[in-house]
Curated annotation (Swiss-Prot):
Entry similarity comment: Belongs to the AB hydrolase superfamily.
Segment annotated as transit peptide: 1-14
Active site: 117, 141, 291
Catalytic activity: ethanol + acetyl-CoA = ethyl acetate + CoA; acetyl-CoA + H2O = acetate + CoA + H(+); ethyl acetate + H2O = ethanol + acetate + H(+)
Source organism, top-level taxon: Eukaryota
Pfam families (alphabetical): Abhydrolase_1
One Gene Ontology cellular component annotation held by this UniProt entry: mitochondrion
SS bond list: none
Subcellular location: Mitochondrion
MF terms (GO), sorted A to Z: acetyl-CoA hydrolase activity; carboxylic ester hydrolase activity; transferase activity
Enzyme Commission code(s) on record: 2.3.1.268, 3.1.2.1, 3.1.1.-
This protein's name: Ethanol acetyltransferase 1
Record-linked InterPro entries: AB_hydrolase_1, AB_hydrolase_fold
Length: 336
């Protein structure tokens, strides 16, 4: 018997694209009774998800952040995720360039970044390379260093997803397809929360508007919305990497909040040292969680984000727009 595993040499390659347009959702804040509340719509929040996540992963949290900060929140799909194009390369310099291009296309001249895991490293790099674009940032459980010690985690993610595609081969017509996929992934991922997050990208029919040169829905089998086979190496090597050459000598002096999981290995002593060096204007919040902070401590991390952005939002605001300031004008708009 020959193995069912597809040989890498026979795989169809992804196209090479320097930048790709990022799919997004925009969550607007609820209207305030105070018409002139400084919502800073010119400085929205851009939320970047983790590996194999999507703009839909934490949709409710993003809406809460929009309401809690009176600020629009863009949730985006990173390349090779969700509704965004499948293309290489997948290195951090390219992913940060995608963020810059997204802001340019949307006409955003100053943004606040929130990044989790993979998205955290992208956010840190974007702040370092494009400080004129990034007003401030919240970095959730990651550090600006190479992390070979987390390669095992990435390998398990990829193995579990490949197992569904190449071994389980679940038909799209199977009514219990998602539970069967979860059961198949248990061999590599006993953690149900992680499986649930990865399964968000698993579908039994082609979504409207979805296009990929390598994901084939004509086979009659359930598919991930990620090009898993083509990303097998990148998801391990590129995700755990950090671009030391392109960031040499760079520092970001804007305010940055780091949220660290006390049970997570992602921010170690080396990472802490590097953070202090290149992000001198940093604050830390420790939460009693593993790396899965967004699932284990959702209310806590959302509050940390809102408190941080609210504390820094008025640094450049006119005094008559700041609630509590002696010059604040209490004009109330009752059209809510």
């Amino acid at each position: 018997m020959f193995p069912t595993r597809v040989l890498r040499s026979t795989l169809q390659k992804l196209p090479h694209r320097e930048t790709v347009p990022m799919a997004y959702d925009l969550h607007m804040p609820q209207r305030s009774l105070f018409q002139n509340l400084n919502e800073k719509h010119t400085e929205p929040i851009v939320f970047l998800h983790g590996i194999f996540g999507s703009k839909k992963s934490y949709e409710l949290d993003s809406k809460m952040i929009a309401h809690g900060t009176h600020t629009p929140v863009y949730t985006v799909d990173i390349r090779n995720h969700g509704q965004t194009s499948h293309a290489m390369p997948f290195n951090y310099d390219t992913l940060a360039q995608d963020v810059k291009e997204f802001c340019h296309v949307q006409g955003l001249k100053s943004v606040k970044l929130v990044g989790y895991s993979l998205g955290a490293k992208i956010s840190m790099l974007a702040a370092l390379k494009y400080p004129e674009l990034v007003k401030s940032a919240v970095i959730i459980d990651n550090a600006p260093v190479k992390q070979p010690y987390i390669e095992l985690y990435m390998k398990q993610y990829v193995k579990s997803m490949l197992h569904v595609l190449e071994e389980a081969k679940i038909k799209t017509t199977d009514k219990d397809w998602k539970n069967k996929a979860s059961d198949a992934m248990k061999k590599f991922l006993p953690n149900g929360v992680i499986r649930k997050n990865l399964l968000v990208n698993l579908v039994n029919k082609k979504p409207d508007g979805f296009e990929s040169p390598v994901v084939n829905f004509d086979e009659g089998l359930i598919q991930f919305l990620n090009p898993i086979r083509q990303m097998e190496e990148a998801a391990v090597k590129d995700v755990t990497d950090w671009p030391e050459e392109s960031t040499e000598g760079l520092k970001y002096n804007g305010p940055v909040k780091f949220i660290k999981g006390l049970k997570s290995p992602f921010i170690n002593e080396e990472g802490m040292t590097k953070i202090q060096d290149i992000f001198p204007n940093n604050e830390f919040a420790n939460v009693n969680s593993s790396h899965d902070i967004l699932d284990q401590r959702p209310t806590e991390y959302v509050k940390i984000i809102c408190d941080f952005f609210n504390a820094h939002r008025y640094e450049s605001a006119p005094s008559n727009t700041i609630i509590g300031h002696k010059d604040f004008k209490t004009t109330i708009d009752m059209r809510v």
